[in-house]
Amino acid sequence: MSVQILHRRQSNNSDLPLPTASLPVQPAQAAAEAVAAVVARARQAQREFARADQATVDTAVAAAAWAIMEPARNRQLAERAVADTGLGNVDDKIRKNHRKTLGLLRDLHGRRTVGVIAQDAAAGITEIARPVGVVAAITPSTNPAATPANKIINALKCGNSVILAPSPKGQDTCALLLSFIHAEFARAGLPADLVQMLPAPVSKTATAELMRQADLVVATGSQANVRMAYTCGTPAFGVGAGNVASIIDASATLDDAAAKVARSKTFDNATSCSSENSLVVVDAVYTPMLDALAAVGGVLLTASEKARLQALMWRDAKLAGSFTGQSATRIAELAGLERVRALQPAMLLVEETGVGSDYPFSGEKLSPVLTLYRATDFAAAVERVASLYAYMGAGHSVSLHSSNPRHALQLGQELPVARVIVNQAHCFATGGNFDNGLPFSLSMGCGTWGGNNFSDNLGWRQYLNITRIAVPIAEHVPDEADLLGDYFARVGK
């Protein structure tokens, strides 16, 4: 695309324009124009969809859900995701795509998001659901099908259109997902432009422009993308960094704890931000916990093996992408740890004593490499976790394996976390599961601790405006003494 600049001939005889050489359109301008075309189609589709009744909205939700849940398509998406990104494994992605979407459908089933959604006669308040408009959904390579589907379904449930800005590695998987959604929309008589993605190849410039032109941004993925979302000038929800720690106290059932940690840490090769990165084990059960971890496939590295792995996993203080989302056996192979590779480990275990940039195993690893810390008692374990979160992962969540309910309350009151997950496989539980009450989501709000403006699991409420009608009610002015009496009794009036 080019722009032709015209100059007028400086002559008394003619003022006809003379064409000069065509000048190329700058990348930012081209991106803005391309994004504007996509947004215009999304706005037109959303304006029509905003007039739909609840049944039509729920049909759109079901269509998008079935597009990813239908077994043959689910497998295609999982296979494409692994082939394109090189992260995780097919079987676990199939399970994730299905269960996370099924759970979201459960959360949304029967919930009103069109028209009047609540009335309080005593307060004289009527609440009306209103769409936010066009949603820009920024999605990561770690979940290139499940996360986009979750955002699409939530957006549709609230009467919005959505435009995906996937990571470059995940864009082909997103395109395949959209083709499946559009096929279901055609069957249901719904406009395809309700769900779109940026034209490939997706660039940072185009993503930034989409954020600027949309009505709401929901960003999951790198902290760079989250920061860009929060500074784009458009209302935004972004998630915090993971670096989950799990405490094993003296009252824990060790075999159960080890089995759950292993299930969580190995699922999809630990590509989830909710998988455990560190285990903090109290002295009283440290050695038997090591035995329990060994029984479920954990292999403890020697000091020299740990040093070799560290040197290769981090280059210039940055986690090497070649290790992300790989199996433990593959990581051992990449690091040249032949003894470990021959054992076919499920997890690699490394003992650590420090926290911070000089101790990179104390941070998020996005791989089945688990860091072990030893604590003298529960109080020391809490202090250790606090130091981990001061370095990385504040606001996300903490895991506890314990028979002492007071310990869970203590963690909830003292640590900078939005979730305390008790006696569960952490990566399944944090984003909602069928055996806990948390909403199903793949985007975890981390509160102000994690630089976020919400601490919930990202869900349908974040995709909705609410208009409140207030009518007069009988006036009731409280007595000053009723509200300030206790204060006056303590300090005087």
Swiss-Prot record:
Family annotation (Pfam families): Aldedh
InterPro entries: Ald_DH/histidinol_DH, Ald_DH_C, Ald_DH_N, Aldehyde_DH_dom
Superkingdom: Bacteria
Keywords carried by this UniProt record: Cytoplasm, NADP, Oxidoreductase
Any one annotated GO CC term: cytoplasm
Outcome of gene disruption: Mutants do not grow with sulfoacetate, but can use acetate, taurine, isethionate and sulfoacetaldehyde.
Functional summary from the UniProt entry: Involved in the degradation of sulfoacetate, a widespread natural product. Catalyzes the conversion of sulfoacetyl-CoA and NADPH to sulfoacetaldehyde, CoA and NADP(+). Specific for NADP(+) and sulfoacetaldehyde.
Name by which UniProt lists this protein: Sulfoacetaldehyde dehydrogenase (acylating)
Organism: Cupriavidus necator (strain ATCC 17699 / DSM 428 / KCTC 22496 / NCIMB 10442 / H16 / Stanier 337)
